[in-house]
Amino acid sequence: MLSRRRGVNTTMTTINHTPAGEQGGKKRLIHRFSWVSLLVCWLIWVLNAYDREMILRLGPVISKEFSLSPEQWGNVVALIMVALAVLDIPGSIWSDRYGSGWKRARFQVPLVLGYTALSFLSGIKAISHGLTAFVLLRVGVNLGAGWGEPVGVSNTAEWWPKEKRGFALGVHHTGYPIGALLSGVVASLVLATFGEGSWRYCFLLALIVAIPLMIFWAKYSTADRINTLYLHIDSQGMTRPATQESSHVAKGEGMKTFLRTLRNRNISLTAGNTLLTQIVYMGINVVLPPYLYHVSGLSLAASAGLSIIFTLTGTLGQIIWPWLSDSFGRKRTLIVCGLWMSIGIALFYFATNMPRLIAIQLFFGLVANAVWPIYYAMASDSAEERATSTANGIITTAMFIGGGISPLLMGWLIQFGGGWENPAGYIYAFFTMAGCALLGMLLQLMTTDKTPRKAH
């Protein structure tokens, strides 16, 4: 009834095939529904990143409390991080079966509330006082957080025209460096204010923010709104993200759709690059806090705070590079970013004083976070329309497998180099990460660009 009063067509409408170029002289406007959905999905991503990254900021103090060696800490982090990969593909298939567009948000709400509630429990010492209990709770958190990533990415893409997909996913993914930055700031404040024994307080925040946010999102995401949005996209001469306001993968077709998507060369090669890049990104997060504490001699609070400097330029990079990929092309942008990342991580060899450490972090940060939305845009551009979340789930799974490998590898390299106090292991880690970034760039060279070209 509401949609009829507003004059909105409630039936599923087909795409307007008017070429975008025919409206080339008209300024294309983005509907407010796109901006509101982007803000909500961005805030969800900030919470996801904050919660996921916090354990890395707290690495030295957790290792100290439970008397963990570098290799033992690497094993703990690997177990927690590999949980991010477990439910991505089955969860994405389930999400695609439930429905795309406005229905996707209804799927997202209980998921976000569930994993932030588990995180809250891990912040209560009476529940998580032992290492086993704490690790099991964090594994539960990451099962949900990993599942939520491709769902959130797909949700963002389905509220924006295809020509602006790179920009939208880039802005969405600025939530990750912001969340990572907040994790360092909050960890530093908690440790400095309450002492190192109160580090669990850091895990209480996410649920408090998530509850009102998800109540709003459940009410906001409706068929009427997204249908109005798609009609507006048609009127602006741009391409809808989907031909109808909601579609789904039919029952019994999920595995067939997944296998077709996995066989897509663009998606599988981009997933390989994603895995290697995540070894780099997770590696620098695992390595920097103990490097600053054990080698540079900073306090626990200072090492947590100064290990996230690269997120300052990471936010800027996540807007510029994905936006540039809309016109320059996803493939070429990823190749440039891969080479930049390899050089940036190798430069940590020269980070022998604080000014150099800060400068190198800022240089590395310009691409450290930028590549993820471009990977998702590449997968979304190459996927079947109804299988967007499945394609993004493959990317996410590859990413989190890399995230599980990375702490094992970094812990072993630090141990091999002589342990926490010896700089040699950290140098081995930096050059190993540089090689991974370079190898990922070579994989991307073998893909074909599917970027929509009528973005301007």
Task: Mark where each language-model region is.
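Cytoplasmic membrane-interface "Motif A"-like loop-to-helix N-cap segments
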Residues: 97-112, 327-338
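Cytoplasmic helix-loop-helix junction between adjacent transmembrane helices
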Residues: 137-174
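C-terminal membrane-cytosol helix-exit motif in multi-pass small-molecule transporters
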Residues: 207-237, 440-448
